[in-house]
Amino acid sequence: MRIGVARDNAFCFYYEDSLGLLRTVGAELVPFSPLSDSALPAGLDGLYLGGGYPELYAAQLSENRSMCSSVRAALEAGLPCIAECGGFMYLTEAIGEHPMVGFLPGRCFDAGKLARFGYVTLTAERDNLLCRAGGSIPAHEFHHWDAEQTGDTFTAAKPFGRSWPCVFATDTLYAGYPHFHFYANPSFAVRFLDACRKGKHHAGTDQTDGH
């Protein structure tokens, strides 16, 4: 399964072990740059938008309208996608005053401080791309930018009682601020690849890979 992985200065936070596990369960990882490529690579079966610093490159990401359109069209066609933290921000309507992909509602804004910082346990309220209802995985949040809407498919719980809804998730999407390590629950990686196999959506088949 060909999984497009955003890798550039804006999207650079990945657990290498998590990428290795995706390879182990059948993924071919295809790097691309939302900053400089004009469209998604051809023939993708899934998409992984990791964390990073999209707020520092918001103007450049926004100016690359062809890539924004390519990503949105792929997601609207049902391409399975994981978007963590910075990747989630990229899918919203805007980062600050800079329009983004616009697949998810709401804008991202500078909170002026760390927002919901620390380790949490994510528990799914509904079946989704990565697990069934009740499935859980350790995760963490570390970000100074927040979003007007952050989703409610999962509940994030701190070790000492505080909890909140988070993450937009469907049968083909996980998009939210929490980062997780696939080895904390390898079934999440297996389920993601299964969705990619079942979907066999091929995004950007009429496009040329920018690399």
Residue ranges and their predicted role:
Residues 29-31, 103, 139-141, 167, ...:
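Conserved beta-strand scaffold positions in the cores of enzyme catalytic domains, especially
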Residues 54-128:
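Cysteine-nucleophile active-site neighborhood
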Residues 127-171:
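Catalytic beta-strand/loop cores that center a nucleophilic Ser/Cys/Thr
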